[in-house]
């Protein structure tokens, strides 16, 4: 895989994008369905170097989740209205 070969020749991974840097580590976010989460980290996929958001549910068993950054920050359409998938709440 070309991406993997390029990564193996680099001494350090590329810097995180401005979008990744805008994610507030430790911040609370609300999913568009109403459930609260805390962002644990922004990470990289080991093979593709894609940016990922690691977050934890603030309900139930407190499960850990990982979602590609572009999905975490995208808008979703519900009942013909656009909403952020996750909204920063503090």
Where are these regions (language model features)?
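Mixed-charge, low-complexity intrinsically disordered regions
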Residues: 1-90
């Amino acid at each position: 895989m070309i991406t993997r070969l390029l990564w193996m020749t680099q001494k350090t991974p590329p810097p995180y994008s401005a979008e990744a840097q805008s994610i507030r580590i430790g911040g609370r976010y609300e999913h568009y369905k109403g459930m609260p989460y805390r962002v644990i980290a922004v990470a990289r996929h080991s093979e593709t170097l894609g940016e990922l958001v690691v977050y934890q549910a603030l309900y139930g068993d407190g499960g850990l989740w990982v979602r590609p950054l572009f999905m975490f920050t995208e808008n979703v359409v519900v009942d013909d209205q656009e909403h952020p998938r996750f909204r920063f709440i503090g």
